[in-house]
């Protein structure tokens, strides 16, 4: 046990980041030694004062690598790893169980080792059950499992046939899954497994990290994995419109003297915080800087609700009166309950209980606020038309696909904006490692960057990223320099990202094909051979072949790899209109995911025959075909 170093998952990392940010109130990127005890408490690892003092004396010598008496996030994570790996892990396990609302389970899966602690939050379970019950209450396909009981474990059982997960993915990101591909009646273990594959591969395609989750885990209803996946899916839906190109009224949140492109770089979380503060300023109330500590007394929420509640000014609008009578209640829980009763008048009593508000649960309070924003943003787009409207075009399908691909692999932090979030190349280095291009991390500048010269540090990273691409990855990067990545030059950035995605896809194929190098020619040859062997009439000459716009070569290939997966009555083969082609493409991509191909491409990519994305579709299907042979 002494030598075991605990690995920390991305989800845990996000929770540690949440805890760190709560204590790092001034956003300096550091916490001081005297704040360490609070930090452990926030990280679900409360330790007595003497223990913290011992740690400060002993471990600071090792962990505080730059000896500045402060700890940055990386140092904190290594400290947590150290603690969880040693004797303290015993008390850690006990303390995590005692933490309010935490249910702990021992490790039971073949992957998890003996003694691992998988805890899950009772509050999250209750919140997600209520959200799903409301979201899918009118769906006839879910009548057999809804409504679920928030106070028992029915959530974990209800996900077992895959239908609920598929439905929630479509609720968060409409049209991701073609309903015709979901198995709904007379389910068998095989058709259930297909549904779960469809859900996992579709979740991946909308940017959820599913690296450590298998269909078996979902079938067994492993709580920590189920809740982790559900939170990602729900968050995609909650954040979908908190984006300026999709909601121009957010321009109202520009600060004095701020440029629009600065506002566009903010994450949905940062935009939500700014939205709340915009309304609090109008109410004459003090700003908040987080969705945990600062909202625990519910008073900011009272003012927010009062600002966004319909005033009845418009012809078809009914006035909603926010009752402040509970505002001065001495009891925090009672005050929170009164506030939530006001939220209920807006149809927004979701995600949090009074206890979640008072405890400052950051995840659930964030969801509560996002739902308020989506229901009553109460923003008016400024009349001033002096903004650069080209900035408001939003991301292309290709950009979104690349971003979802990165996020599904678990890069950290999450990529919200393809260009600005890659401007320091840290995400690109992670992608290099995932594509087996070695990165010398001693050459990489880490966050937080100094105020003075910070951009220079980012450009140094970008220069190294381009150098790695040319020398180690052997990519074609003619005319690309570090400053192009730093400035977010779309064409040149996409050229690098495409080569990373292509390499990643081909690596998967090479692994299945005994290490043989794979190229376009080999994929096309395999596709045509497989189609011919199954007596199919379709074939392709290249990834630009116009026949691909019908999706028939894709559907026939799926049928050749997994007979009976395609229901032929769903496929239109003659006299195809544009809509027919689109329907075929939607069905093809969903069925491909259902048989186990992790496809990121969109139906439009097939209809419009986008060669890059078409290549990934056939490569993923080839991977599935080779896997079957093995």
UniProtKB/Swiss-Prot annotation:
Residues 11-46, 51-86 form the EF-hand domain. Ca(2+) 2 binds at residues 64, 66, 68, 70, 75. The keyword Acetylation does not apply. GO terms for cellular component: actin filament; actin filament bundle; brush border; cytoplasm; stereocilium. Residues 115-630 are annotated as: Fimbrin core. It comes from the Eukaryota. Residues 376-624 are annotated as: Actin-binding 2. Residues 122-238, 266-377, 396-505, 517-626 form the Calponin-homology (CH) domain. Keywords: Actin-binding, Calcium, Cell projection, Cytoplasm, Metal-binding, Phosphoprotein, Repeat. Residues 108-375 are annotated as: Actin-binding 1. It is found in: Cytoplasm; Cell projection, Stereocilium. GO terms for biological process: actin filament bundle assembly; actin filament network formation. The keyword Phosphoprotein applies. Its main location: cytoplasm. InterPro entries: Actinin_actin-bd_CS (IPR001589), CH_dom (IPR001715), CH_dom_sf (IPR036872), EF-hand-dom_pair (IPR011992), EF_Hand_1_Ca_BS (IPR018247), EF_hand_dom (IPR002048), Fimbrin/Plastin (IPR039959). The N-terminus is blocked. Pfam families: CH, EF-hand_7. One of its GO terms (molecular function) is calcium ion binding. SMART domains: CH, EFh. Actin-bundling protein. In the inner ear, it is required for stereocilia formation. Mediates liquid packing of actin filaments that is necessary for stereocilia to grow to their proper dimensions. Monomer. This is Plastin-1. It comes from Gallus gallus. The lineage of its organism: Eukaryota, Metazoa, Chordata, Craniata, Vertebrata.
């Amino acid at each position: 046990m002494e030598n075991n170093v605990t690995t920390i998952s991305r989800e845990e990392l996000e929770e540690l980041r949440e805890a760190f940010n709560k204590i790092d109130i001034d956003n300096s990127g550091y916490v001081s030694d005297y704040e360490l005890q609070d930090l452990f408490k926030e990280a679900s690892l409360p330790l007595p004062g003497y223990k913290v003092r011992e740690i400060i004396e002993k471990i600071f010598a090792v962990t505080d690598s730059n000896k500045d008496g402060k700890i940055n996030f990386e140092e904190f994570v290594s400290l947590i790893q150290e603690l969880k790996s040693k004797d303290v892990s015993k008390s850690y396990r006990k303390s995590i169980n005692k933490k309010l609302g935490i249910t702990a389970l021992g490790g039971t899966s073949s992957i998890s080792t003996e003694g691992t602690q998988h805890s899950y939050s009772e509050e999250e379970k209750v919140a997600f059950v209520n959200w799903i019950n409301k979201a899918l209450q009118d769906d006839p396909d879910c009548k057999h499992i809804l409504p679920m009981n928030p106070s028992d474990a029915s959530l974990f059982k209800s996900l077992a046939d895959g239908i609920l997960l598929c439905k929630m993915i479509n609720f968060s990101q409409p049209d991701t899954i073609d309903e015709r591909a979901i198995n709904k009646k007379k389910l068998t273990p095989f058709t259930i497994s297909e549904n779960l594959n469809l859900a996992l591969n579709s979740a991946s395609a909308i940017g959820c990290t599913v690296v450590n989750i298998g269909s078996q885990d979902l079938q067994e209803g492993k709580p920590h994995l189920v809740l982790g996946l559900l939170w990602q899916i729900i968050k995609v839906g909650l954040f979908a419109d908190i984006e300026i190109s999709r909601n121009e009224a957010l321009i109202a949140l520009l600060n004095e003297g701020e440029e629009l492109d600065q506002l566009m770089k903010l994450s949905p979380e940062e935009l939500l915080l700014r939205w709340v503060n915009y309304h609090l300023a109008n109410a004459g109330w003090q700003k908040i800087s987080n969705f945990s500590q600062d909202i625990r007394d519910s008073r900011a929420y009272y003012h927010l609700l009062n600002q966004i509640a319909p005033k009845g000014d418009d012809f078809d609008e009914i006035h909603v009166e926010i009752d402040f009578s509970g505002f001065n209640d001495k009891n925090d829980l009672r005050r929170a309950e009164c506030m939530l009763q006001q939220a209920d008048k807006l149809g927004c009593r979701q995600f949090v209980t009074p206890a979640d508000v008072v405890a400052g649960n950051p995840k659930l309070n964030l969801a509560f606020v996002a739902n308020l924003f989506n229901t009553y943003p109460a923003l008016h787009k400024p009349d001033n038309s002096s903004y650069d409207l080209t900035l408001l075009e939003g991301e292309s399908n290709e950009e979104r696909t690349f971003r979802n691909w990165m996020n599904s692999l678990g890069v950290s932090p999450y990529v919200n904006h393809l260009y600005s979030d890659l401007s320091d190349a840290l995400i690109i280095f992670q992608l290099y490692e995932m594509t087996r291009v070695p990165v010398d991390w001693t050459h990489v500048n880490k966050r937080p960057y100094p105020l003075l010269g910070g951009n220079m540090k980012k450009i140094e990273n970008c220069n190294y990223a381009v150098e790695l691409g040319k020398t180690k990855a052997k990519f074609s990067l003619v005319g690309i320099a570090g400053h192009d990545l730093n400035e977010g030059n779309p064409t040149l950035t996409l050229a690098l990202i495409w080569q990373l995605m292509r390499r990643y896809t081909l690596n998967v194929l090479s692994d299945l094909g005994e290490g043989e190098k794979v190229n376009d020619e080999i994929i096309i040859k395999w596709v045509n051979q497989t189609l011919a062997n199954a007596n199919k009439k379709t074939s392709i000459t290249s990834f630009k072949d116009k026949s691909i716009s019908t999706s028939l070569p894709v559907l026939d290939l799926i049928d050749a790899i997994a007979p009976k997966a395609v229901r032929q009555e769903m496929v239109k083969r003659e006299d195809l209109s544009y809509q027919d082609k689109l329907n075929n493409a939607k069905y093809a991509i969903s069925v491909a995911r259902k048989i186990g191909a992790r496809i990121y491409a969109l139906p439009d990519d097939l209809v419009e025959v986008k060669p890059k994305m078409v290549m990934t579709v056939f490569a993923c299907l080839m991977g599935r075909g080779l896997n079957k042979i093995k």
